[in-house]
């Protein structure tokens, strides 16, 4: 193709045309006919918020690189896209948009609001994903709010219930007062907080004194069921077995002992209330203490709080502290740092409440989960320990019921006669118990039921994604299960990874995937995690519009799995500069390519063999790096090769062969075409738009590149000796080019004579023509040994700042002497005697500056350039 038809500069706006081409051609369709090895990616289903953020970009670039690399290596890749629709984020957004709470409208109306918003957001995110060049097979898209996926989730519930792995019980659970729902421990985040530690006197019931407790939760005084001290704490040995009265409430509670009390914290006296934290739960269970509910689902005090009933928690805390002060019970307050558990969605501090909820029996399966996790490949491998540590820390089962609306309904009714749990048949699924009735009577014969109104934790949908993409339980699901790869962030190892291994293993007896690649978080340029509140968020569209998706993909790929990644505009600009440099190289090469480019190398030009050796070594490095999921290593190797070896060195070294019709011209064209085509293919998983765009100009169909287009490795081209000899020639060429540049000599101006000295002329005798013609040298010689040179001093000047102060009235004599004598003779005297005497004084080398030139054995003035292996002499151009 003529260069007249190719834009002068790289135009990233062509990316949109390629997106349309890939969709139109079904380039990334999963075939599934067994004719190729399959590679299955268990793609994360994001919440449909309507916007991709940089964390999405990073995660999906990782998996897209892998998908593209595998397709290019003739794998049949299943790269689906799912949407985890249900849960709090959508409900919270709907409440915000419509200025309502979930209970202000009917369940059906609220659910419809959520569905409409979700559909809109999914469509927005689909478009953004396509702009990024992600190669999902959109025929394998799943949306968790659709009936077929609700059926799958509910079926998994029935199967685990029938295995006694799901049960209902009254148990302490984590509760979010803002979202008004139970949440699992994995959904609790911890943030640092400074609060007041309040020292409060509890009077002994027998009047013998006080027990001073230290608490950060005085609002829970009404729910205090005991006071506890360490059995070996001698300060309180006289209190063992006694009772104390609660301030304000005047109710008596026992003083008990427990070895888990920290005597160093506060006063060493702790009140047990229901419930301040998990330790309270353990003590209440251990000592069979009463449970007093003090806070309701909205985070307001219950009637047991007396005059504080109806107050929000913070308001009650403030009021009760004031009353404790007034009544003389509050001894002092001091600041204390603590980790507060908050809801991971709305960041509201969680409360522990006792509720009847549905649970998955996790604790009985932790050993199985760890065993399955160990059998998988983790990249990086230390991420496995996050899951192992989480599994070993589990002391509560997974609470899966939620008091929300927009989620998969729990498929349960309760018989109004015998109160048994009634389940639907598998054929009836999916069901909404608030709308549907079971398709059979209760075992007692009753046909009157009360529906379960709670819904399932959204992780119940997303923790079976390997089964979802396999179309479980429909025939043939086993052919694409388990998945090959689970790509995900390290922040959801304890949720998505843990729950998926648990549920899929419980349902199938097999692990859900073979490998996990873990990505980190994205940080802003200020070094903090990207956050709206910090104002450091960069929207992907802002980068794509200005620099294109491939520049953003290059930034993403230049990172290490598991590590957090800082965003930097300078990295984006550098990536774009790289693409423009390669584009310019392509335009130059294309100008010289024609239908006569040979199919193979016919000559022995070392520079050609040098670049082909380095090209195939690059192929090997990049292939190994992709197999190891080390994208940064692959990208950096490509950068270095394209920028330096190919553009800066090889192209410059062969230009003369392209402009002259000589024997080696055809080989130069073959080599240029081979290098650019191979490099574009190696880059294609990272920069699919750029590689496809240029490849089409070079005559390759889009599918040829993306399907089966990974370049063949030619080991026979890799030659250490060739690379060494080629590097010698490149070093000399570089030195001569730099010399011309630094001396203001045009690159196309002839150099008269260049003499090269070395210990072994064989190192460069095969590359003399390339050195000579690349640098426009008229005469070039190569000799063994070192050059015979002498340094000639051509001028000498006194250093006035030293001569004046030191020699005072004699300074003029020294200045006159230096000006009137041959600088070469003065230099010889200084070298021989160390000084020159002028009248009553003498000066040394430290009193003068000199300018010298090198002179060859035959008297010519020369410049010398040095590399590690060579001395290069040039006659000074007059």
Where are these regions (language model features)?
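Active-site-adjacent bridging/hinge elements
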Residues: 35-43, 65, 98-102, 126-133, ...
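Short, glycine-/Ser/Thr-/acidic-enriched flexible segments
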Residues: 46-48, 85-86, 181, 190, ...
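Structured ligand/cofactor/substrate-binding pocket environments in proteins
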Residues: 55-67, 74, 83-84, 152, ...
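Short hydrophobic alpha-helical segments that form membrane-spanning helices or hydrophobic packing faces
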Residues: 170-172, 224-226, 354-355, 468-470, ...
